Amino acid sequence: MKGTAMNGILPLYKPTGMTSADAVYHARKILGIKKIGHSGTLDPNVDGVLPLAIGAGTKAVPQLMASGKVYTGEITLGFATTTEDLDGEVVDKTPLTQPFTADQLDAALTAWTGNITQIPPMFSAVKVNGRRLYEYARAGETVKRPERQATVSQFTRTDEPVFSATDGTQRFRFEVHVSKGTYIRTLAVDVGKTLGVAAVMSQLTRVKSGGFTLKQAVSIEQLKAHAAAGTLADVIQPIDIAFADLPQVDLTVEQFEAISHGRFLSLDQQTPRVRLHFAGVLKAIYRREDDQYRPDLMFLANEKNV
């Protein structure tokens, strides 16, 4: 399969210590294809699911990015850093003399559940006046950061909190379900603010993204093994998995000929968008407009990966 046309989605496992760009580089080298993009950056100190779009699958990146994400991680109370995680320098300490109760911690998480407003951390890739925030931060500059809206559909504690009287800290693990663009580091800091203490995100793993779970993710080593064995089709998922929530329409030969020329279709459907299949393969996404379906995304060259 290497060196041939490949189209699809690869749920890759990115380990800590690797950038998302590095992960794409390794995938390009292993697969022998340049047209690969990812659907949401993972910081180097975060591991987890990084869906990669391959070939024509890159057209599905916006759809993948729009899907919700699930993380598990750890929050530590008692100090804050420049980066809101353990990579930064400590800038504030509020040593705990006694632990918060489980109920107090749970209430703080509940306070940040629902539709929330966030201010992106200075060490982030958000652009302000043409420069990324981390560029300002590295230069020792501060700048007004735009507020962002996010949705946290679930934010729960998943273990018993651990208190250290020696360090004056308390840590606990959590699971959070969020919309795209949500900063988990900032959520950790905000939880601390609700409790009246400094806080950091001390560990994070993305366990679901683009509809793919951690169990489905393939490591770089596993990807190499599949490439060597000629079994890449076992791990590269078809493009239409990104559009699984859309109704599927199986085209006739005449209908496929019509969409091959960009023509509109009259279909017995009412949904805003549909996915069009021919010979068992996704060929297009059409959108409804004026009682007809018109081209939205085209995948005419898409074939089954073998």
Swiss-Prot record:
The active site is at residue 43. Keywords: Isomerase, tRNA processing. Signal peptide: none annotated. Transmembrane segments: none annotated. Its EC number is 5.4.99.25. One of its GO terms (biological process) is mRNA pseudouridine synthesis. InterPro entries: PsdUridine_synth_cat_dom_sf (IPR020103), PsdUridine_synth_N (IPR002501), tRNA_psdUridine_synth_TruB (IPR014780), TruB_C (IPR032819). It catalyses: uridine(55) in tRNA = pseudouridine(55) in tRNA. Pfam families: TruB_C_2, TruB_N. One of its GO terms (molecular function) is tRNA pseudouridine(55) synthase activity. Responsible for synthesis of pseudouridine from uracil-55 in the psi GC loop of transfer RNAs. Belongs to the pseudouridine synthase TruB family. Type 1 subfamily. This is tRNA pseudouridine synthase B. It comes from Lacticaseibacillus casei (strain BL23).
